Amino acid sequence: MKIKKLTSYLLGRNYEAQAKLFLQKQGLSFIAANVKVHGGEIDLIMKDKQTWVFIEVRFRKSGQYGDALATITRSKRKKLLHAAAVWLFQRGECFETSSCRFDICAITGQQFEWLQNAFNQNEFTR
């Protein structure tokens, strides 16, 4: 792995760890991190009481070219939804029978933003 990629990887893991600690302080229970399934990766999976919470963590050094939240495109949301559906299916669950939400932890410079229920599976159904 090249140094720049390694540095980006470690930086990403650092911010994911910070997000995990923050969310635990808010009362969420940690389940898993960096879950890879066919078609995607979920940064953090946590539980908020009986609700599965799938979390995407994004970081930008500055907001000069848009904040971290702006990097979560429709395509990225669709991949996260698919990855969560696969993860649930592997456990005998699905969106229709489980309480789920998709949160975003966006870090731009020193600013930390937690968006609960930032999007959901209904965005892609007609």
Curated annotation (Swiss-Prot):
GO MF annotation list: nucleic acid binding
An example Pfam family from this entry, by short name, is UPF0102
Which pairs are disulfide-linked? none
Which family is it part of?
Answer: Belongs to the UPF0102 family.
| NCBIfam families cross-referenced by the UniProt entry | PRK12497.1-3 (NF009150), YraN family protein (TIGR00252)
Q: Which HAMAP family match?
A: UPF0102 (MF_00048)
Q: Write down what this protein is called.
A: UPF0102 protein plu4003
Which species expresses this protein natively?
Photorhabdus laumondii subsp. laumondii (strain DSM 15139 / CIP 105565 / TT01) (Photorhabdus luminescens subsp. laumondii)
What are the leading ranks of the lineage? Bacteria, Pseudomonadati, Pseudomonadota, Gammaproteobacteria, Enterobacterales
